[in-house]
Amino acid sequence: MNSDRRYETIKKAGWLVLLLLIAVWPFCAEAAGIRMVSVAGEKVNLRKGPSTQDPIIWELGKGFPLKVIGSKGSWLKVSDFEDDVGWVYKNLVSRKPHLVVKTNKNTRVRVNIRSGPGTKYEIVGKAEYGVVFETLERGTGWVKVKHEKGLTGWIKRSLLWGW
């Protein structure tokens, strides 16, 4: 009987640990140093190194999402949805969530933007590879987004990169 009580105690403790892990899981990526940012300015340079003296790799547009993979002083080492790596000055990015269309790179096929979170909803627009959206709301498998020109709708999450 004594071993039965110990088993029940261990079982309850296991469930408690599992519930705790589920509760803190969304914060683990941030705690591990994995975080996302988006370009705050209209045109921000992605550079080869953490200095204005380093060559420019790309010029990034407003809202472009980036994953932070390191830092040095006032500079962030980032990667984009195509796995390009470079450096941006940290005052030129924000924590406002954005997404970019990541599918159909080598085709002219565009993704559907819908009036609601599902394929049953009306198509209100289309977007091609590389188009950036502000993230408004997250649903199950779908994200409500807004384009800089005002179009708002839902896109299947698996077609996008960012947060």
Each predicted region: which residue ranges?
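Boundary regions of SH3-family modules and the immediately adjacent low-complexity/disordered segments
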Residues: A32-G41, S51, P55-W58, P65-K72, ...
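Sec/Tat signal peptide C-region and signal peptidase I cleavage site
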Residues: W25-A31
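Residues at secondary-structure transition points
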Residues: L20-L21, P55, L136, L159
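Beta-loop motif signature
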Residues: V39-V68, G73, N106-G141
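N-terminal secretory signal peptides that target proteins for export/translocation
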Residues: M1-I10
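Bacterial N-terminal signal peptides
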Residues: L16-W25
